[in-house]
Amino acid sequence: MTPTTTPVSNPDALSTGTQDVHTLKGTLQRLAPGTPLRDGLDRIVRGHTGALIVIGDDENVSSICDGGFEFDVSFAATRLRELCKMDGAVILSSDLERIKRANVQLLPSPTWPTQESGTRHRSAERTALHTGVPVIAVSESQNTITLYVEGKSHMLEQPAALLNRANQALGTMERYRDRLDQVNNRLHLAELHSYVTVIDVVSVIQREEMLRRVGEIIDGDVLELGKDAKEIQIQLSELRGDNDRERESIIADYLVTDGIPADEEIHAALEAISHLDDKALLNPANIARVLGLPPTEEALDEPVTPRGYRTLNRIPRVQKFLMDKLIVEFGNLDALLNASVEDLSAVDGVGSLWARHITDGLGRLS
């Protein structure tokens, strides 16, 4: 039997600013170290009392609440700690500004599936699924804090463990960045001198994706650490650089399409690469297949010609629409490198000033 009550499908109605309280990301931001709610949770953990806390007091939540007592007081970490000494759940407002109810028995539909074994955690997971709002369970015996939201469960880690993991990941990311810079420079030289092979392109794409993945892992730790992650965030930004734009540029250069690739085709190729598991990513044939190139070992040494997006991207202030016009007109990077100022300025929308700027930029790069 399927439960008849459905989770909230439009969380925008309960947003605070640009942060949505119904998402894992939005809730983790509000549970970061130093926030009032996290302070209250840490007090509960230290007190070994356990807790069941619902973030939201809409009709879906009210419909499964039984007993307890209603009041409307401002949120305070100490107040939350005292109220959680009682057996029932505590209901908070969606903006976390008010404590609405306490000592409440939650009665979500028992037909919602749960993998939890403890009574408190089973109730928390089912309540989150039933209402669509975030629910927090604090284990009395294990001193752990588990968040249930968006059909997922997430156990909060101590800041020290998160910092240690993030720093280790930064070390890995630094090695990935060094290797990416090496293969990137090699590909750049090959592009300027017309000896690019498929494996040159694949090697760069592989390392760009590896850099993206480890950066995504660190993003999660940064989110959960909150204000404690400022230094890590700075290092992450430096190591990441302009990787997202560079990933789009290399796909735009080498994706096999009729004419210049559309944005949708570029994003579809990047999405396909992101779905490869780590082992599949290391197989050059899989990347070649996404690009529309022959996925054979022999074909990896075949020459390919770039359209010119990567090189034009290295020239300051050249916008994508100008790149498109130039590449439609000249076809590939070799023709662009051999074009004169007059040739470039004759392209519709380019003009003499941009033509001179682009010619000078190409000259400096080569």
From Swiss-Prot:
Listed EC numbers: 2.7.7.85
Domain DAC: 21-159
Keyword entries, A-Z: ATP-binding, DNA damage, DNA repair, DNA-binding, Magnesium, Nucleotide-binding, Nucleotidyltransferase, Transferase
Gene Ontology BP term (one): DNA repair
Cofactor requirements of the protein: Mg(2+)
Catalytic activity: 2 ATP = 3',3'-c-di-AMP + 2 diphosphate
Subunit structure: Homooctamer.
Family, as annotated: Belongs to the DisA family.
Annotated protein name in UniProt: DNA integrity scanning protein DisA
